[in-house]
């Protein structure tokens, strides 16, 4: 199962940690894992390249299917509107995957909200 932990402070997402394999299909054929991976990495890359938001990637582990990413300035209430939109789009995508395929494959935890 994929577990997405979304960390909030004052309603701003300042960190996310996404870990695990969906187990929907065999390695290399799992469309849920592929969808989550591209969604998350595209969001991080877009924020890095298209906004002034500070991004800190704490850990990436391909074997564990883990990414731990932090946006330090957001914890202090500083954020860009562009990054906010991109993060909301990522969350919308994660929720859509969960609603489409079920909670047996992806769990989303909102922490601090």
Predicted regions and their residues:
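Conserved ATP-binding N-box helix of the HATPase_c
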Residues: 35, 40-47
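N-terminal intrinsically disordered, cationic/polar leader segments
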Residues: 1-31, 45-113
């Amino acid at each position: 199962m994929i577990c997405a932990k979304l960390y909030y402070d004052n309603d701003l997402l300042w960190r996310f940690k996404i870990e695990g394999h969906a187990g929907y299909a065999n390695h290399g054929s799992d469309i849920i894992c592929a969808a989550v991976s591209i969604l998350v990495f595209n969001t991080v890359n877009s924020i890095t390249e298209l906004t002034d938001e500070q991004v800190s990637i704490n850990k990436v582990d391909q074997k564990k299917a883990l990414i731990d990413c932090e946006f330090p300035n957001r914890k202090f209430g500083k954020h860009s509107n562009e990054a906010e939109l991109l993060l909301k789009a990522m969350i919308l995508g994660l929720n859509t995957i969960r609603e489409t395929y079920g909670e047996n494959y992806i769990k989303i935890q909102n922490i601090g909200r």
